[in-house]
Design a protein with these regions (language model features):
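Sec-dependent N-terminal signal peptides
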Residues: 4-14
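Sec/Tat signal peptide C-region and signal peptidase I cleavage site
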Residues: 14-20
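A subset of solvent-exposed loop/turn segments in beta-rich extracellular surface proteins, enriched
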Residues: 21-206, 251-269, 353-356, 361-378
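Transmembrane beta-strands of outer-membrane beta-barrel proteins
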Residues: 35-41, 87-93, 156-162, 216, ...
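Transmembrane beta-barrel architecture of outer-membrane proteins
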Residues: 76-78, 95, 136-140, 164-166, ...
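Structural signature of outer-membrane beta-barrel channels/translocons
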Residues: 83-89, 94-96, 145-151, 221-225, ...
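Membrane-embedded hairpin module used as a gating/binding unit in multi-pass transport
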Residues: 215-223, 230-243
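Outer membrane beta-barrel transmembrane domains
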Residues: 244-379
């Protein structure tokens, strides 16, 4: 009887899972205990920075600029999938677009001053660093869930998923350098390395950039008899894309390159030099692992939860609550501390819709996102 009670509780929990985690990761353990056929579709988008309004990222940054010491982060994610489920199996066609930009305070300050056409006190030193990585891909993913028994008070669900991906676009960039403000501008010395699948250069060998790869997802859920559960998900574990025929360039800018004229006098000129690879490159991209852990505890008609996401060394803590209106409907409310977004959601046994933003005025929001899921069982 106790075993049946835990299994029933697990199936009720999974039938209307709320994706409160900021990264909205896939958890293959959701499929454990499922029965029958079904179809589903989902779409998710997140635009987030922690130093400027997301919609103004390509603008002049204006009043929304609020940098901080250390790494200033910008993330763009869009995912869509549609597929079928059968018992504890799930097969889906997927689309992924993911970008991450990490820059230090000196670089974003330097960009801001130039966007705003602001003068800077002479002698100010900027040590700039930038890392950027992004890709787009489509493919297929197969998930499988497994049910295990821990003891009389708890069940364990496990899951694994494998994706086969075809890349459609990629870009990888690193930049570093130093700039010193002067009365008339800047003295600078900087280097950029950039591989962009959409770039074209003179004399480059013919070829069309293309990518292929795979991704491994793992998940686990522990469900206790009193209704509490711990959810763990790791996406893109031991995963990679191989990009063929990638253009590549390295550029160096120096404001004080030594030159001697015909009379032998020394003077300094600003120069911009670069080397474009004639032969296209093969680049192996290790997809960054993404993880999420969340603990839910029931309290009457409410569930209280706390958790955190993780990616590339960055943490995304969240706190929230879920209110059970009745057996078919739930609402959710959560807050993330990294981008300071408030998330609200509504959950039905057949669909989920949630949105988040760091401001009621989307144009001023440093982060905003939307998630929609529909699951229809064939009864």
């Amino acid at each position: 009887m106790k075993k049946y009670g835990i299994s029933l509780l697990a199936s009720m929990t999974f039938a209307s899972t709320t994706h409160a985690d900021l990264l909205v990761l896939s958890n293959p353990a959701d499929m454990a205990g499922k029965q029958g056929w079904g179809t589903y579709t989902s779409a998710y988008e997140l635009m987030a920075t922690d130093f400027v309004a997301a919609k103004n990222f390509n603008g002049n940054w204006g009043q929304s600029y609020s940098p901080h010491e250390g790494t200033n982060l910008a993330i763009g994610m869009a995912r869509a999938e549609a597929g079928i489920t059968y018992d504890s199996w799930r097969l889906a066609g997927i689309y992924r677009s993911e970008q991450i930009i990490a820059a230090n305070r000196d670089l974003v300050d330097l960009i801001y001053y130039n966007k705003q056409h602001q003068s800077v006190t002479a002698g100010q030193i900027f040590n700039a660093n930038l890392y950027a990585e992004g890709f787009m891909a489509k493919g297929l993913r197969l998930d499988k869930g497994f049910e295990l028994k821990l003891n009389d008070n708890a069940d364990l669900s496990l899951g694994a998923g494998i994706s086969l991906l075809q890349g459609t676009r990629a870009r990888f960039a690193n930049a570093s350098g130093t700039a010193v403000s002067t009365a008339s501008g800047y003295n600078y010395n900087a280097t950029l390395t950039d591989s962009n699948s959409r770039a074209t250069y003179p004399y480059i060998s013919p070829g069309t950039p293309e990518g292929s790869g795979y991704a491994l997802d793992l998940g686990a859920k522990v469900i206790w008899t009193q209704g509490a559960h711990l959810d763990l998900a790791v996406n893109d574990l031991f995963s990679q894309m191989i990009w063929h025929n990638m253009p590549n360039t390295m550029e160096t800018a120096n404001s004080a390159t030594l030159v001697r004229n015909a009379a032998g006098y020394v003077y300094f000129n600003p120069t911009l030099s670069g080397i474009n690879s004639i032969n296209r490159l093969t680049i192996v991209q290790k997809l960054p692992a993404q993880a999420n852990a969340q603990f839910n505890y029931p309290a009457g008609d409410f569930d209280l939860f706390a958790g955190t996401g993780w990616m590339m060394g960055y943490w995304f803590p969240q706190l929230g609550t879920i209110y059970r209106i009745n057996e078919d409907w739930k609402t959710s409310l959560d807050y993330d501390t990294q981008f300071k977004t408030l998330g609200i959601g509504i959950v039905h046994k057949y669909f989920t819709l949630s949105a988040r933003s760091s401001s009621l005025a989307i144009g001023n929001a440093q982060a905003y996102g939307l998630n929609a899921e529909v699951h229809i069982p064939f009864e």
